[in-house]
């Protein structure tokens, strides 16, 4: 099982022209469809999508080669995208600091594509809904507060748990709870990311958000002397700017967030690890 960010990362690392993800994203499985990823490792821009659409036949094609014949022609090969992603994570984060920290981590995969990779990175995490179930047990795997009540209850029941992280069906979005089981929305996560990356890690760059995000992001960018831009709703607008400019943090209100040093793509696992690294370095809980 590969998450959407794994495919996006694979496209860029392998120098591919295009990536295709079959996913319902944060929707029920009946919404399964295509997500296209461009060569830069992010959501395809309108020009790339239009180029693909030109090749869609008016009638369904029936005379397609079998998978065996395609492999015989050398047109198909298999790549372990999970291993590629894991190695990229291990080279990018201080994972030992997170693993050796004193806080307990909760993780809700919502039966989605993060159910293998997150426990692999952090084996000590207490997992919920980390099973393979293509139907998501009938729930919509969107990491918003009303869909995460069992996860909130699990966190409240464990006095040692200081953070809960949830991902959607294809693991590109994030939801978060503090140790008291209070939901932490994307606005607050973005503020934490900006503070950590600039104040702790000394990084600079542009701040790009959609107009539905809290104005406190603009205020913080101004305070730090950083350039900022507010875009229309839709992560593709953020991704397009990330491919052309030096962007420190980008995000939208719906849980799609991206940061410097990674692909121009939403990545719920990556953002969760960034917050965990912040906690480990600061020695503080999420609530603090």
What does each of the following model-derived ranges do?
Residues 1, 21-22, 107, 127-129, ...:
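General beta-strand structural signal in soluble alpha/beta enzymes
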Residues 1-31, 120-121, 125-177:
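N-terminal small/polar loop signature for handling phosphorylated ligands or for N-terminal nucleophile
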Residues 2, 43, 47-51, 80-84, ...:
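Conserved active-site and cofactor/substrate-binding residues in soluble primary-metabolism enzymes
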Residues 32-159:
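Gly/Ser/Thr-enriched, mixed-charge loops and adjacent short helices
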Residues 134-141, 195-197, 238-243:
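Short, charged, surface-exposed secondary-structure boundary motifs
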Residues 160-163, 203-288:
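Phosphate-binding and adjacent anionic-ligand microenvironments
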């Amino acid at each position: 099982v590969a998450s959407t960010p794994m495919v996006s990362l694979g496209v860029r690392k392998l120098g591919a022209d295009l990536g295709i993800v079959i996913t319902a994203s944060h929707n029920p499985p009946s919404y399964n469809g295509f997500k296209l990823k461009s060569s830069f490792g992010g959501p395809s821009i309108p020009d790339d999508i239009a180029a693909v659409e030109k090749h869609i036949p008016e009638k369904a094609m029936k005379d397609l080669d079998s998978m065996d014949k395609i492999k015989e022609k050398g047109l198909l090969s298999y790549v372990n995208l999970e291993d590629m992603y894991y190695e990229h994570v291990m080279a990018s984060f201080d994972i030992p600091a997170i693993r050796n920290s004193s806080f307990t981590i909760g993780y809700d995969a919502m039966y989605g594509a993060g159910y293998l990779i997150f426990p692999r990175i952090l084996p000590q995490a207490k997992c919920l809904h980390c099973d393979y179930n293509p139907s998501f047990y009938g729930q919509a795997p969107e990491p918003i507060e009303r869909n995460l009540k069992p996860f909130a209850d699990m966190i409240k029941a464990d006095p040692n748990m200081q953070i809960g992280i949830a991902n959607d069906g294809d693991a590109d979005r994030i939801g978060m709870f503090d140790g008291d089981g209070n939901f932490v929305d994307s606005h607050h996560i973005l503020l934490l990311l900006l503070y950590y990356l600039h104040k702790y890690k000394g990084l600079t760059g542009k701040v790009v958000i959609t107009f539905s995000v809290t104005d406190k992001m603009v205020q913080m960018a101004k305070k730090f002397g950083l350039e900022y831009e507010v875009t229309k709703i839709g992560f593709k607008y953020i991704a397009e700017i990330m491919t052309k400019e030096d962007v420190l943090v980008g995000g939208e209100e719906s849980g799609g967030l991206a940061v410097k040093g990674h692909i121009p793509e939403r990545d719920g696992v990556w953002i969760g690890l960034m917050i965990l690294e912040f906690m480990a370095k600061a020695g503080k809980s999420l609530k603090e």
